[in-house]
């Protein structure tokens, strides 16, 4: 009986204060691609703090050929940012949970400083070994950017840090 109690207590504690590195890639409206690399610190009840670096590319059709060519894809509009997000858990189930994502960032495009406010929903599915798969619906408000609003879907993976 005592062994079962100790095993249960250590299992519960293992989910608290866990850390993960995550990589997510997504498509944003209109003609945008997004990549985020982050460090996530999970606190009690699947609430979490996320420290992230984000890159964004917006492509356009080439003026000379009317198609998307390498120059119109890679050199049209690019931005990056570094930020923090708080993610309170709003739904829990067996091997999955959902979090709101509320954050802020600062960064740059090729010309000016950008500020951002980030809002969204993230749903996580827990796999063996502490790995997680997630999808995220994100809405970003970018201050002084080419796009004022960015919205889209991101898919990613989270790897445990021991």
Task: Identify the meaning behind each predicted range.
Residues 135-137:
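Internal, hydrophobic beta-strand segments that form the core of beta-sheet-rich folds
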Residues 23-36, 76-78, 105-117, 141-150:
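Solvent-exposed loop/turn segments connecting transmembrane beta-strands
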Residues 12-58, 152, 158-162:
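Short glycine/proline- and aromatic-enriched beta-strand/turn motifs that initiate or cap beta-hairpins
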Residues 1-8:
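Bacterial N-terminal signal peptides
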Residues 10-12, 91:
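Intrinsically disordered and other compositionally biased segments
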Residues 40-133, 159-162:
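Gram-negative (and chloroplast) outer-membrane scaffold detector with strong preference
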């Amino acid at each position: 009986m005592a062994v079962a109690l100790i095993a249960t207590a250590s299992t519960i504690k293992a989910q608290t204060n866990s850390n993960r590195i995550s990589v997510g890639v997504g498509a944003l409206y209109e003609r945008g691609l997004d990549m985020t690399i982050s460090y996530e610190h999970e606190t009690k009840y699947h609430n979490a703090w996320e420290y992230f670096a984000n890159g964004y590319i917006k492509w356009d059709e080439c003026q000379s050929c009317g198609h998307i060519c390498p120059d119109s894809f890679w050199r049209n509009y690019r931005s990056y940012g570094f930020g923090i997000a708080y993610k309170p858990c709003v739904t829990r189930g067996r091997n999955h949970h959902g979090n709101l994502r509320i954050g802020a960032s600062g960064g740059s495009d090729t010309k000016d400083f950008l500020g951002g406010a980030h809002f969204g929903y993230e749903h996580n599915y827990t796999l063996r070994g502490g790995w997680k798969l997630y999808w995220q619906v994100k809405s970003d408000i970018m201050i002084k950017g080419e796009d004022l609003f960015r919205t889209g879907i991101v898919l990613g993976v989270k790897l445990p840090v021991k």
